[in-house]
């Protein structure tokens, strides 16, 4: 995006508003923010532009996003977490060189087990079944929650808005609902 067109305060307020909306819309016991490439970009920016501020808690990404205030657990320096038995990754390590035509299939090819990832801003699902063990694995990638007409992605029309809702039971079994947002409606 052209830096002259940036409205950092407006973008920041939009981000906080989105976090509040998510918290109000979904009644779940705990929310997580998994540190990934976006947070790393903030760290690189601060190190290059304002290194003297790096030690101040006020300028940490978790304080800027008010994660404690919103009851969101910040997870840093961890490749993945699990919701029940389902591994959850951001995907920046798996999709380092792009996601290809079918991101969920590419995810499966990399992790070889059921998993859900974001990062590619595209909803997809791929299921595979082992002919040896009869085990079935499914991988999902989720859409994004940003504005649908971002300047940096004009080269692609494959991005879609979306998110996943994951239910788990006491045994760790899970159910994934990979939602898309199309024309303002959750589908």
PLM segments and residue spans:
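Conserved beta-sheet core of the metallophosphoesterase superfamily
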Residues: 86-179
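Active-site-proximal loop/helix segment associated with metal-binding centers of metalloenzymes
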Residues: 48-87, 91, 98-102, 113, ...
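Acidic carboxylate-rich catalytic motifs and surrounding loops in phosphoryl-/glycosyl-chemistry enzymes
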Residues: 30-37, 74-79, 177-181
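Core catalytic region of metal-dependent phosphoesterases/phosphodiesterases
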Residues: 1-68
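Flexible, charged surface loops at secondary-structure boundaries
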Residues: 24-27, 68-69, 82-83, 107-111, ...
